[in-house]
């Protein structure tokens, strides 16, 4: 029997504590290799959590992702639950009509999106009501009215304590 809950924040902290220098390797949407460590993933996930909280995202708010499998997506997997949000991954292969239905049905209020998938977002933008769109830009400029992920993360110190979540 564990004497503490196995929540996402706990798993993140444990990885950063016991394996801080273990390399985390992934691919960016442009297929280039990205390398970091568990300590770096933990810090950036906490920065994302702080940035989302600063935007007014709160416990139970749904944060959707429309992106490919890469390091920033991993940061969202940890950062969103860390601040008490609900991570909702969207399938980029769905039609715009189906994506709009899923976003609306789930009640997503924030969307994290790969810049290469902005054309997909454009096709459903008028069908969904999102408070914030945060772009995982890869050397491209972020459209007006949207937030650059790296700027959001860089504005935080990475000390977000996290939301105390109950396992049961």
Where are these regions (language model features)?
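A short N-terminal helical cap/helix-turn-helix that marks the beginning
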Residues: 3-25, 43
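Acyl-group handling in specialized metabolite and lipid biosynthesis
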Residues: 1-2, 33
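Solvent-exposed, charged/polar functional surfaces in cytosolic regulatory/catalytic domains
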Residues: 14, 18, 44-51, 155, ...
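Conserved pre-ATP/AMP-binding loop-to-beta segment of ANL
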Residues: 20-22, 156-168
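Conserved AMP-binding/adenylate-forming core of the ANL superfamily
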Residues: 24-70, 74-78, 95-100, 148-151
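Structural core segment of the AMP-binding/adenylate-forming
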Residues: 11-13, 54-55, 82-151, 161-163
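Active-site-adjacent beta-strand anchor residues
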Residues: 5, 66, 111-114
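Short acidic-aromatic active-site loops that bind/stabilize oxyanions
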Residues: 1, 38, 42, 163-166
